[in-house]
Amino acid sequence: MTETTEAAARQLRETTVLTHLEAENQHDIAATLATFKSGAARTELPGEVADGYEAVADAYRELFIAFPDMRFDVNPGSLCHHDDRVIVETRVLGTHLGPYRGLPSTGRSVELPLVAIFQFDGADLVCERAYFDRIALLIQLGVGRDPNTTAGRIATLLNHPMAVARAALRSRRVPRS
């Protein structure tokens, strides 16, 4: 690929990613899906994969119901190109006002750093992978505990007594220097 062609492809991919993120910020599922290659749509979040238009639409629908004010704080300068991918470092913000993964509304606000990797087939978007700290999300929603805090240690003890007991036994066997 010539430098001019490569620059044009990069610009097209960047425009597609920004259009995609703006559609997500508008909670416009049809416009979000329209950024994917015809017949191909896939999103991957920690622990789950949505493959195909209907599954992807359902994943977005659940997010937009759970976090009706969800938005990505995108700085266009945070986009990075690598081969057939565009990588975006952003923050996602929102208020948990609807059910999410079986968790009823907590009314809590969340603000998480997120990295999204958009994979392309030529100029066509085929997959979006998002990476974020699920523990941080659960802590911000009020249902998780930082295991390094007193509350976190108590929660771990109460929720996982056998694991704590085994760890305590193992620690007694380790010779101390």
Question: Language-model segments: what does each one mean?
Answer:
Residues M1-S177:
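C-terminal and inter-domain tail/linker signature
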